[in-house]
Amino acid sequence: IEIVALVSGSRDTPVWCMIYDELVYEHEADIFANQQKFVKPLSPYEVFLANLEAGNDDQLIIRDLVDSYGLEIGTKKAPCVICAVSTVEQIYQKYGYHTLNRVLRLCIGTWEGDMNSFSANILNGITKLISVFGDQLNDEVFKEKVGAISIKQLVRTAKERQAGSMGYAEAMLIEYNGKKKNPAQRLSMNKLHARESSIFSGLEDSTAPDEEWTGN
């Protein structure tokens, strides 16, 4: 009922039902299977809103955190709007509140709410860097160095490196290190790849061709 009301915008929306009498288990299963062919799955955004309506803690915490940065979760790209809601949930559920908080802080501080900066691959790329390097990753240096290039250039470099969010993590790490020659001042690309892949399990990269960039 909550989901129907949420999607339709009204609690007075009629819901069509059919009642079957004296069904055997096999017939019931067959009816259910056939009905699922015509069921439109809810989008991640609709599921997120339904969880908010249900008062679930994870989604309430995520919403409040996003709001605290002057951002919002939505379905259409716009400045300061995060459309990659399932990515935000995955980061929170796997890495916790403080990591998600830092990811958002770096993202907004680096690109100042650019609508292209909240893609799944960029959010996951930042998450990878934070997970691997922790406090070795200097937030102010990140914002200065990585923020010096456009999202368009970042996307281009990432695609040249490799597919998915690891390409973005590599591209951001290259910009972060800049021309530093002292190994003690550089973050190691080898370390980024040396960590067990299990640390990144649960982070789903975007496969949408237009997800990364909107603009000329």
Task: Describe the function of each predicted region.
Residues 2-216:
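Accessory terminal alpha-helical modules
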